[in-house]
Structures are given as C-alpha cells and as structure tokens.
UniProtKB/Swiss-Prot annotation:
Keyword Repeat: yes
Domain called Fibrinogen C-terminal: residue spans: 1061-1278
Signal sequence coordinates: 1-28
Protein name per Swiss-Prot or TrEMBL: Tenascin-N
Function per UniProt: Extracellular matrix protein that seems to be a ligand for ITGA8:ITGB1, ITGAV:ITGB1 and ITGA4:ITGB1. Involved in neurite outgrowth and cell migration in hippocampal explants. During endochondral bone formation, inhibits proliferation and differentiation of proteoblasts mediated by canonical WNT signaling. In tumors, stimulates angiogenesis by elongation, migration and sprouting of endothelial cells. Expressed in most mammary tumors, may facilitate tumorigenesis by supporting the migratory behavior of breast cancer cells.
Pfam families listed in its UniProt record: EGF_Teneurin, Fibrinogen_C, fn3
Domain of life of the organism encoding this protein: Eukaryota
Family: Belongs to the tenascin family.
GO biological process: axonogenesis; cell-matrix adhesion; dendrite self-avoidance; negative regulation of neuron migration; neuron projection extension; osteoblast development; positive regulation of neuron projection development; positive regulation of sprouting angiogenesis
InterPro entries given in the database record: ECM_Regulatory_Proteins, EGF-like_dom, Fibrinogen-like_C, Fibrinogen_a/b/g_C_1, Fibrinogen_a/b/g_C_dom, Fibrinogen_CS, FN3_dom, FN3_sf
A GO cellular component annotation in the UniProt record: CA3 pyramidal cell dendrite
Amino acid sequence: MSLQEMFRFPMGLLLGSVLLVASAPATLEPPGCSNKEQQVTVSHTYKIDVPKSALVQVDADPQPLSDDGASLLALGEAREEQNIIFRHNIRLQTPQKDCELAGSVQDLLARVKKLEEEMVEMKEQCSAQRCCQGVTDLSRHCSGHGTFSLETCSCHCEEGREGPACERLACPGACSGHGRCVDGRCLCHEPYVGADCGYPACPENCSGHGECVRGVCQCHEDFMSEDCSEKRCPGDCSGHGFCDTGECYCEEGFTGLDCAQVVTPQGLQLLKNTEDSLLVSWEPSSQVDHYLLSYYPLGKELSGKQIQVPKEQHSYEILGLLPGTKYIVTLRNVKNEVSSSPQHLLATTDLAVLGTAWVTDETENSLDVEWENPSTEVDYYKLRYGPMTGQEVAEVTVPKSSDPKSRYDITGLHPGTEYKITVVPMRGELEGKPILLNGRTEIDSPTNVVTDRVTEDTATVSWDPVQAVIDKYVVRYTSADGDTKEMAVHKDESSTVLTGLKPGEAYKVYVWAERGNQGSKKADTNALTEIDSPANLVTDRVTENTATISWDPVQATIDKYVVRYTSADDQETREVLVGKEQSSTVLTGLRPGVEYTVHVWAQKGDRESKKADTNAPTDIDSPKNLVTDRVTENMATVSWDPVQAAIDKYVVRYTSAGGETREVPVGKEQSSTVLTGLRPGMEYMVHVWAQKGDQESKKADTKAQTDIDSPQNLVTDRVTENMATVSWDPVRATIDRYVVRYTSAKDGETREVPVGKEQSSTVLTGLRPGVEYTVHVWAQKGAQESKKADTKAQTDIDSPQNLVTDWVTENTATVSWDPVQATIDRYVVHYTSANGETREVPVGKEQSSTVLTGLRPGMEYTVHVWAQKGNQESKKADTKAQTEIDGPKNLVTDWVTENMATVSWDPVQATIDKYMVRYTSADGETREVPVGKEHSSTVLTGLRPGMEYMVHVWAQKGAQESKKADTKAQTELDPPRNLRPSAVTQSGGILTWTPPSAQIHGYILTYQFPDGTVKEMQLGREDQRFALQGLEQGATYPVSLVAFKGGRRSRNVSTTLSTVGARFPHPSDCSQVQQNSNAASGLYTIYLHGDASRPLQVYCDMETDGGGWIVFQRRNTGQLDFFKRWRSYVEGFGDPMKEFWLGLDKLHNLTTGTPARYEVRVDLQTANESAYAIYDFFQVASSKERYKLTVGKYRGTAGDALTYHNGWKFTTFDRDNDIALSNCALTHHGGWWYKNCHLANPNGRYGETKHSEGVNWEPWKGHEFSIPYVELKIRPHGYSREPVLGRKKRTLRGRLRTF
C-alpha cells in the first residue's frame, strides 16, 4: 500500500465517522431513552513522525492543539515540521439509562476502534524505523508500473519496465549485449542490427547481389565474397585459388585460368648410374602433395613402372635395372589428386662388373683369394696387394679360369698384417671396374705360459709376447667342474691375475692374442688354489651363559672346522671341533655380561684356512625380588635385588591403568627408587631392567596402588546473611562421595552433610548473620577417607531497613532508618549528587538518623546507608533527597564557526521546565530559542560570518525565571569552497575555488612536495584559481587554502593534486605510451618487449580510432624515394615526423615473441575522401623466412587488398621473392610483400598514374590512381581507449595531411 493510499483510507473512514455522528440525534434514540441526559465527548489525536528525508509534504496543522478533551501531543511537538496529525472529536449524548447495547452505538464504537487500529498501523509503517531506513522515493509509487515492497524496500516492476522505480522501458533481450537501451529501443553497436541487436549486419548489404540471412550474405549464382561484391571466377578457381573481379589467383602449386592444372616439375636430371640402378633428382616444390615417378626401357612402354615419392624427397634411386640399357624416366607433380604434365629424362645403365671376391684361407704368412668370373668376356686379371699402412704394392697377373671362379694364393706375407687387395678384369689393355677387398694374415700365439702366486681365489699367469701387431690378449680359465671365465689383457702386458677363483680348485688356463676379430692359436697351463676361510662369522641367540655362532661354509673340500673362544679378561679359553657339514655351534659355560672373542677356521689334513673372528657378549641378568612399598597419593617406592653383571644403569618404567607411561633411569649402585607424579587412587604396573650400553636385561615387574587424594582449593563464596557456598577442586581418584562439616565459632554448633561424588560445591544453609564458621571437606570410598580440607565462612551483616528522607532545605536533609540486628561497629552514610559529587560520613552504631550538610541547591541526591563491622559491610539501603533551585552559571561560548556557535553553562540545580537563549548581533538583529531542561548547551545557528553577538541564557519554571547569564560570540571567517584540481598533467594542474561570503583581505595557498618540502603562496582576494607548475610526474601533492582578514584566518579547505604517472615504466608499444597519459601524437621511445635495454623511437598516433598506434609507414609528400635496396627496407629509412619506413627487422621484433596480438590499420586519403582498412592480425616473420607477411580478418571502408599478399615474402629490386616471371619490385618501383604482383602498393612511385606503378590500393582507387596520403600503423588487437587528460604535444596531423 502506498503512502498516499495509507493516508486516503483513514481519512475516508474519519469522514464517514463524522457524518455518522452528525446524524446521531435522529437515529440513536431507542424507545425509553431521553435526550436530556449528560453529554460525553470522545477526542482522539494521532501524530505520525515522518522522516525529513521522505518526499512527503506536510502542511501546518490548521486546528488548535487545545480541545475540550485532553491533548495527546507533548509540548513542542506542534512546532515540528514533519509531523502529520490526525484529530477527530465525537460528541455523544449519553442518556441516564444504560444504552450501551444500542446497535447504532455498538456499530459506531466498532468503526472508531477500526479507525484507531488503521492509524496505529499507518504510524508503525511510516515510522523512521519502518520506512526503509530513509528511502526517499516512496512517493514515486514505482512510477505507476510496479509494486513497492516494504519488506524488501524495492519495486517489483511490470513486464517491459525496469529501473529502481520502474521508470524506464525495458529493451527486448537486453539488446543481446550488443547495444544500449534508450526509452525501450535498442541502439545497436556496430556491426549489430535488429530490434534486439541479435545478429550482425551483412557487409555492404550484400552489394545488391545476394540476400542477408542473420548477418551472412547468401550470394546470387554469379557473385561471391562476404559482401557478394566480387564476380565469380571460372569453376570457382577449382577450389585452388581465390577470385578477384572474375579472375583466378591460384594457390601455389596450381596454374591455369581456373587453377585446375598442377605446375609441371622442373630440373629433372641424372645424378648417378650403375649397371642396375639410376639415381635421379629434381627441383623441390613445397606446394605438392607428392611426386609420381615412372620409368621403362626405351621402346617398351608397356613394361613401365610407377613410384609415389613423398613431397619432402627430391631425389630417387631406381633399382633392379638391366645393365647397359636405355631407360625413359618421367616425373609428375601431384596436388589434391591432380597430376601435372610430365617432365622426361633419357638415361643408360653401366656394363656388368666382377662378382664377389673373398679370402678363402689365411695363415700367418699367406692369403688365398678367390672371385667370381663376370658374364662378359675377360682375357685375364691383374691382382695388386700391399699392407694397408704402407705404400708398397705388388702386382701379379692371374689368368682367367675356365671354372666359374678364379683364385690366387699370395705368399711371403707378415703375420697379423692387414692387406689391401685389388682384382682388375682386363680385356686387352682396357681395364674394367676393379673389385676391392681386404685380407689379414693370422697372428702368432703366445709362448712359455706359466702360473705362480696362487691364493684362495687368485692366480698370476705370464707368457712371452707375440711378434704380430695386436689389440689385446685373451685369457680363459676353466675349473675342474667346467666353470669358465674369460678376460682381456692389454697388448703391452705379458701377465695377468686371475680373480674370482674357487678355493682348493684346479683350473685349466688358455692364453691367445687378438686383433679385431682375428685371434692366434691358444697356449695353455694349470693352476691350483688354496683353501678359503669361513666367512660372515656372526653371534646370535645370546643368553646369560650361552651363545650361538654361525658362519658361511667354505667352498673348498675340507675335513672339519675348529672353534676357539676366549673371555675378555683372558681367564679362560676353550677349543671345540665342528663337523665339516656344520656352519654353526653353541658356546656353553659362559659367564653373564662378559664379552668373548671367537675364532673359527677350516682344516684339511695338515692344511688350514685363515682364521675368522667375532665377539660374543653374554646377556645381563635381570633384577630379582621386585617389590613396592611406602605408597602415598602421588608416589611409591620400588626396590629389587641387584644383578651380578657389570652394568651402566637400571631403567624403571611405570604405566597407569589408563595407559599413561613414564620411564626413569636409576644408578647402577642403587637397588630402589621413588616413583613420583602418580595419580591418586590409581593402579600402576612397574617394570625394572638393567642396561649396559645398548644391551638390556629381561624386565622384572610388580604393581603399585596409590592413596585417594583430598579435595584442593577449598574456598567460600556467595556468602549472604544466612547462607554460604563452598567449592573445591574435585579429587582425581575414584570415590563414593564427599562429606562437608561446618561448625559455628560462636557456640560450637556443628552440622555434617554428604555431597555426591560428581559435585564440587555445596550451599551451607541455616547460618546466622555476622557469625564465622569453620568448614571441613573430605572424600570417601568405602571405609577409606582422604585427608580433610578446611576453610572459614563469615556470614554477612544485615542491612538497615526503612530508610527515609525528611526536613530537606536548599543545603541540608535528614535521613533515618531502622537499626540492624547484627553486632556492628558503626553505620556509614554515603550521598551523591546528580552531577557525581560524593560525600561519606560515619554514624555511631547506637544512632538511627543523621543530618546531611553542605548540599547544593536544586540538586537531587542519592543516599546510601549500610552497617560495618571490621572490614565487613552490610548491603546498602538507599533513598533520594531533592534541594531547591538556582540559576545558570559559567556561561561560555565555544566551538565557534563562520555561521554557528555553541554556548554552554553549568546546569541549575533546581528542577526547571526549560532554558531560554537570546542572541543579538552587533547590528541589532535578535533571535530567541528555547532549550530543553536536560541540556546545558545549545548551538546558535543562522549566524553571519565575522559578526559579534551578545548571548543571554536563563532558566524558567512556569512563570518563574532565573537571573540571566551573558557572554559574547564572535563568528569565524567562512573558508573558500569547492577547491578542486583540474587540467592535471604530468607536471602540473589548475586549482579553482569559490570565494567565501565574508569580507576578506586575501588567501594563503599551501602545497607540500613528496620530499616533505612545503611551499606557501599569498594570493589576492579577487583570485579564484591558481596554476601549479614544475611538479614531479606521478606524485601526490596535498594542497590547502585559507582566507584571511588581518590576523584572522578561515578554516583550511584541502584537496590533493596527483600528477599523471607512468603506468608502464618501459612501454612496449604506443598503447602503453598512451596509458601513461600521453594524449598527443608524436615521437616517443618504446622498449621492445618491455626490455629497458632495447629502446626504439617510434611515431605514435594517439588520435585515430582511440589512438595507441605505432606508425610504421607514411607517404604524404613524395619527397622521399621508396625505391630502395633490401638492406634499406630491413633497417628502415626516412624521418618518422615526415615520410618514412620503420624497417622489417623492427616490425619482426615488434610483432613476434610477445604475448600481444597486433592488428594493422591502413589509412588512405585524397583531397576530398578518406578510407581505412583494418586486419585483426598482423605479423612479420624473421629474415630467415624473408620477412613473410601474415594478416588476419579484414574490416573497413577501403576494401580488402592485403589478404592477397598474406603469406608472401618481402621483395625489393635486388632481392626477388615473388612468384611473378619478372621482379615485381623492379616493375612496380617499390618494396612490398609482392605475389604476382599486387593489389596494394603503398611503397610505389609517388604520384605515378601508370598501371600498378603508383601508390595503389586497388579495391579503393584501382591500379591507375596514386593515393597522395597513406599511413600504416599497428597496435594490440582489441585495444580501445577513451580520450585521456595529459600534456598536449604539438601534432603533425594537419601538416602531414596537407597534399
């Protein structure tokens, strides 16, 4: 329900009530009722306090506050500006007879009651606590298009409306996130259209050659492209090119008008031929899928074969051919399963050569060579041989054998030498192709092999070295049971040690020499090893008088083992024999805690192995007769018989029934110890054992049961006149109950009460006031009792009763009371004024009244009386005493501002109705205001700055007034207002302000530098602005401003001026330069990839399309020749403030190796027109890739010319990287990413109108118009920037675009 509706309903009800009452004399008289009875008036007045923040207009109450009935409004409320007051008066003629049951009266009373309920409800809803914490828009009623909820303090809008007050029309689909909603209509962002901006617009409206379907052009049959502006090409370029104005531009690898043909391969040639193979190669092409190679003997096309060759391969060896035969070889390029025209090659294989040759037999000084005779005619052979390392070559003539093979035995050779052998077939004097092979004579074998220095597992063998050159010797040795090992020995050595031999074993040893895979004959000898000794001798299962020792059995064949053990003190030695099959034995008769040295060795006949040894310390014996005695609540003594062995200490461990464990060491001389820290009433398990080093004896054990503990920290608290509470810390032991006994000190009366075991406090009752009691508490379990804890309990004294005040004057009052029952020392009377002044006086114990003196007039006092005995006090009885009235004192003025002042005074002591304050200006203007009696200060408002006022204050009660107190108040100068910085740059800013209303002499402006330095400026009274200059970049300056007049100053007004700082200390591009608050176009230093060591000066365009562009090319005057060499285009040339080219290397570094994705913009202008093209991706590759260009998707007004150049390398007149037959840079007078040749030629000859030679952008002005202004620029993709404030720099824009 709205506020107006809430007001409307009760008002209607009230009007109905008034009309009903007006007609009452004619309708309210039932039979038997007289009209001459008493008149009764019912008066109701309601006040609703509406917050001043609510938009509800309240008019003054036209009715007087007084009426025949009592008013429900307090004094002063009628003057409040935001009170809504409803009043109705109902006069009823009440007859003498009981007419309460009359129907009309009943109905009227019911309607009046309903009216009251509605008014109460409205008051609650419109209170400051219910009206949504000061919501000020309730009167809008949600603009009539929704429902306001008091529960949520918000509007619930109708469909199609939105806003906090449903004040706006809603747009369909919230404009799909692609537009702005204005008055219920979507204003779409480019390039979106539709009622809800739901889909993008079609480019160029499909150029009239297609239909637009949800943002995509469906072109007519003869047209194509995104905007259907291009004429379709033959066969749609077969899917192997792109169409431009009806002409196909084929992809690499395709050719023809419709791009249907594959480019023919080039450079097919013969690299190598043999009697059965041909190796061919050709120029590689990266634009094919694979190659198709075919070949056949000349004149035998039907026997041809085809081979598919991968595109990465550009040579192939054809195998399995006939000797001396001519072959036709053809090669085709294949792309997308389309084959090119073939390229042909005629090649011939060689004649047959000798078959395989080999060495059939080798000795130390001869080699037998054999080879296969060829199928062709051969007259004889020449055989040449010589050492591989020497120049000496011998030659012999060998006749051709009639057998399929020929052979020759070469003699007189050196042992172990490799020879190079050549067999040449001869026919007449003509040599055929020779066959080569190598042969090596055998190596001589070692002599005088002997064995010496034999141990259990090693033996040394030696020999006389061989004469041949060798790589190494090989030694092989085999045991009697067939175990064989082999080892290599350096060629310069003539002996070696055989390891890993088995003890007591006979070995056969062989030695021979090797070179490569060649080995000499073997020489041999014999070796017999010694017996091994027992290994891994260990001691285990040791007791106090025995020990078991074990060992690994020896490998050799033996008769027995011998064991000898000796005590550490050498008092006893024993020796025992153990069978050869055993590997352990038990040593008996040992003494506890003694270490023994044990030796074990093997025997066979009179031969003995080496001795193995170990140590065997016997166990310590354990303590005996462990007992527990002298047990208390938290400790127990344990004792035992000492052990016999020599030990370091005893260890005692005791564990409670709850699992808590402690462990303590005990000196070796002791045989008892005290266990401490035990818990009362707890059973403990005790273990004791002896230790020596890491050695421990067996554990002895016993049990210990502690006593019950007594209650602790027994205290008395919450003591009254006849009762006291005692409490204690519960015992830790398990008990049945507590017992509490308390005895009076006065007559010895004693009481004893049981308390549950779960309790730790109890209340002692039946006590007498002011008596001391002795209290004992102890715990019980069965017949067992703990020790008794005791404390004292002193009951309180009873307090005085019936305290009253009488005989009050301005400065005295008499108080009296009934005396207490307890024995006391005195009474104490304590009285405190309303302002906190306190006095305290003692009164004799026989008295029951006293006079309070030194009171202040008109002051209320609180009086307390209580009894004392020693340090003990009774409860306090209290009453009030009120003295008579006086006037205000100490009137002072403080907290004076330019338009207000606070006056304060000492409040009067008397009870008053209010204070009155009157203040008069120096020119006679007077105001008088009432102040509540509770206040002792007030604020004088509506004062004028710089004015003196006379202030009077007095108290009132009814018609009575106190004397007037007076003082003076001088208002302050008002300060300047609205101090604000503006036009802030990196080095300064403008400060502006509004002057004060007071008459002043001038201003003082103060500002502080970052280093703490303060500068002060005095300005004239007419100044309203000041320019701060020479400030530091990115710094904050506190600024304050005061007005002054003579020696008086106004309040400070302050602000801060923060100069523009650099967000990016090392900006990597112009977008970051712009974000450093540089708003003007011009030369700036950027840093490649943000690296401070790689600065680069560039021209930044801060204006075009939000700015942030790095300009890398400009043509606008024609004064700079762009027909440059490769090196110039790589490094860059020209003046960035005029015409220039930034450089390919810089473009590569800017657009690669960085997370930023760059877009490129081309701006074109003539004298009367302008156009632009933007591509959402731009990248220049490295020099290795000839600075290949990559661009993304196009948008703009100039037409798409760069997509044609996408993926192509840069070309200059001295570096041709295009695919045209001629050099495009040479024929088109520039440097560019030419293909075959261009649709864009920004670096062409300035002003040239010949076809394709000028500064062209073909989609905009064609090939025969030279564009007078071109600018190429890049920035991060998607970057946008609202205009920024900053230091303006001079721009070249006007001059750069002057043709």
